[in-house]
């Protein structure tokens, strides 16, 4: 329970820092709120794993896997694939670079302010959950599908290149 309380305190602190910084003009809407789609190409320059490629490569795998899982589970595959396409794009924004604890939260914000469907923004945020023991699970079906797809990709990929949990 104390771990959850600590995480909530950290998240609250990060959100308060974000609000303080934005009020002083650290982050301007025009520069940082570019549509997430425009940031997807930049994922090519971020290494996910030296044998598994870039975050763009991971994103491409997530699109495929999320679509497959969505069809198996009778969920909107287009929404799941769109969320998969955008879910890592906030990692290359200045805001998440400065405040890494806001990954996913900012992804949802950028998605909804970039006129993506609310369900897509929610799935983007939720796919990081649970972040730690005791954290909330994704509440939307698309969020659960994307969260599972992300973990499947990481686990299978890392096992495939001979990396195992210690």
PLM region descriptions:
Residues 1-166:
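Amphipathic alpha-helical "coupling" segments that flank catalytic cores
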